[in-house]
């Protein structure tokens, strides 16, 4: 079954020059890039994207980080795209949970600045794609 997922190549990955490497891994996995945009995240979209973390101690720093520089937002499509990208990304904590061969395992240093975001479910993907790419929401 073809799925869609939202991927963010976060500001730390952009600043460190990993956009091409990450996009290459996505393409080599066989996922289709349906939308791609380099942008700085507006505060309202960032807050809505991370709303589930509101009130947690790391929330203000997370918003500051994600809005603090350019990022790449993308919609990927393919069979089991959500799980496929999450496998490419690796565990959330790049040092303790991400294995070598994954994006975070190969390039990550910190849990919050962990290079990429990928939707974790079909429901999250639909909500996140509607935030970042409203033109895809009805499709």
Swiss-Prot record:
Cellular location(s): Cytoplasm
Keyword annotations from UniProtKB, A to Z: ATP-binding, Cytoplasm, Kinase, Magnesium, Metal-binding, Nucleotide metabolism, Nucleotide-binding, Phosphoprotein, Transferase
Main location: cytoplasm
One term of GO molecular function: metal ion binding
InterPro entries noted in UniProt: NDK-like_dom, NDK-like_dom_sf, Nucleoside_diP_kinase, Nucleoside_diP_kinase_AS
Domain of life from the UniProt record: Bacteria
Disulfide bonds: none
Cofactor: Mg(2+)
GO annotation, biological process: CTP biosynthetic process; GTP biosynthetic process; UTP biosynthetic process
GO cellular component annotations of the record: cytoplasm
Pfam families linked: NDK
NCBIfam families per UniProt: PRK00668.1 (NF001908)
Name of the protein: Nucleoside diphosphate kinase
Source organism: Rhodococcus opacus (strain B4)
Gene: ndk
């Amino acid at each position: 079954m073809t799925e869609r997922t939202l991927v963010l190549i976060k500001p730390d990955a952009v600043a460190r020059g990993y956009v091409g490497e990450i996009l290459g891994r996505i393409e080599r996995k066989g996922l289709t890039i349906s939308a791609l945009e380099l942008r700085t995240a507006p505060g309202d979209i960032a807050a809505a994207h991370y709303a589930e973390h509101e009130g947690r101690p790391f929330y203000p720093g997370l918003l500051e980080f994600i809005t603090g520089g350019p990022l790449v937002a993308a919609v990927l499509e393919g069979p089991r795209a959500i799980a496929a990208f999450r496998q490419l990304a690796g565990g959330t904590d790049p040092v303790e949970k991400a294995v070598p061969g994954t994006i975070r395992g190969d390039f990550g240093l910190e849990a919050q600045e962990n290079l990429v975001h990928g939707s974790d479910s079909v429901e999250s993907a639909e909500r996140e794609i509607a935030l970042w790419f409203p033109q895809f929401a009805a499709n």
